[in-house]
Amino acid sequence: MEYVEPLAPLYGGEYSTTGIVTLSVGIALLVLANAFAYALVKAFGIQSYYGRLLGGIVLLVLSMLLTLSTNSINKFRGAFTFAIGEIIIGGLDVINDKSGWSQPVVSPTVGCQGGA
């Protein structure tokens, strides 16, 4: 009997560390981190753009812990990318707030905006 190698490897092979998987993991962790940051914003009554910075920090810590536990940075590249972006945007918003500028760089909207 002859062994035939499958055309597509099983999950956990080379495709588990490619773009779509890392992007999906990054988006899932981003949603989780932002939900946690939103809860912190609501619990402590701080400005919403501080939540973006907190969400980025939480996401970075989560992705670091997952990377250490699985010993594979390739699966969590998307999470690191989203975390760094959240920290940069949140940090710029905090700097703008401390500088006394009128508007944050990216103002998050909550709820639906009604049309005219």
UniProtKB/Swiss-Prot annotation:
The chain crosses the membrane at residues 20-40, 53-73, 76-96. The keyword Membrane applies. Keywords: Host membrane, Membrane, Transmembrane, Transmembrane helix. GO terms for cellular component: host cell membrane; membrane. It is a multi-pass membrane protein. It is found in: Host membrane. It comes from the Viruses. Its main location: host cell. This is Putative transmembrane protein ORF116.
